[in-house]
């Protein structure tokens, strides 16, 4: 090979280290070595590949030629380091600090070291013993760890089923016992039960809600309601409860005041002064200071009197008139009970003193519908205690002749004869 300096050839050198001829043709690609030009050199590697693994000692960091295998922990070091620690008096393994019984010497290639886990490094004299160690110590342990982790995660993925009967013991401080039936054994999940309890807790209970203080009415006399029972809603609304035709009830039932319809489409106005006493035995009447809002935990039974009207679904709608204190009853068109006449004076005609200057007429009377059940906030306890605000019986406007029972039905006969005109619903 001719070795000539690079400047004697007709080539140009660029910054990338390539030589080009003057004809802009690529001649050769060489390394940038000043003053030399390399040619093609063949290299032959003589030797054999060593398949035996080479391990390094953990103490001296040198390749191990002769292993010093410690029994019983089976950790291996170079033979010099293993004997050095034994001579000095350290009768424990330098890696695991386990007591040393003896030290075995093995040549390179006769020891198989576990490399599955970096911290293990236990040695075995055969490949079969090494595989048994890997299956026993590493694969089974890995499966156990995986199954244990799945058991910890599983309750969060699928919560266990809980019976409703077991929940009141856990929620005693949350006042949910009254909303959970104790004898139900329905299997439901815990989130749905909490959602159901939260909804029942947020719903207003009609039978335990107390009326607002500004709408509580106090009458100067006990009013007995027979055909309807009034209880308050969330905002003090009056609701009519349907009755049952059963006159054997011994408990006290509220009695409505007498009323009469006006042409079957006008709201009837009645006064609570003329209430005929009943012959049945009742509990002591409520005090005059107690509100009119009666709580009926069970469906009221029908205690029928001459003053009661046959009630069917939908029931009557009652409300108070703010200007005069009258009780206005909306009579549905399907009410076929005979209207009752108003009490008369001694000569048989309405008394002239009953028509006071503060009484209202039918034109000024507000028209109430069946959906309008709220009390007017203008009616206060002061108006209820004032006896002058409760007028006597009177007719508001002339009405076409309607069917009416004889006067003896109101005063002479017993009220038990009036019960035969009522039917169950």
From Swiss-Prot:
One of its GO terms (biological process) is protein ubiquitination. It is found in: Cytoplasm. It catalyses: S-ubiquitinyl-[E2 ubiquitin-conjugating enzyme]-L-cysteine + [acceptor protein]-L-lysine = [E2 ubiquitin-conjugating enzyme]-L-cysteine + N(6)-ubiquitinyl-[acceptor protein]-L-lysine. InterPro entries: HAKAI-like_RING-HC, HAKAI/CBLL2, Znf_C2H2_type, Znf_Hakai, Znf_RING, Znf_RING/FYVE/PHD, Znf_RING_CS. Pathway: Protein modification; protein ubiquitination. Its main location: cytoplasm. Residues 96-154 are annotated as: HYB domain. A zinc finger (RING-type) spans 57-97. Its EC number is 2.3.2.27. Pfam families: zf_Hakai. Residues 412-425 have a biased composition (Basic residues). Keywords: Cytoplasm, Metal-binding, Transferase, Ubl conjugation pathway, Zinc, Zinc-finger. PROSITE patterns: ZF_RING_1 (PS00518), ZF_RING_2 (PS50089), ZINC_FINGER_C2H2_2 (PS50157). The keyword Zinc-finger applies. One of its GO terms (cellular component) is cytoplasm. GO terms for molecular function: ubiquitin protein ligase activity; zinc ion binding. Coiled coil: none annotated. Residues 398-408 have a biased composition (Pro residues). E3 ubiquitin ligase catalyzing the covalent attachment of ubiquitin moieties onto substrate proteins. May operate on tyrosine-phosphorylated SRC substrates. Homodimer. The HYB domain forms a phosphotyrosine-binding pocket upon dimerization, and mediates as well the recognition of its flanking acidic amino acids. This is E3 ubiquitin-protein ligase CBLL2. It comes from Homo sapiens.
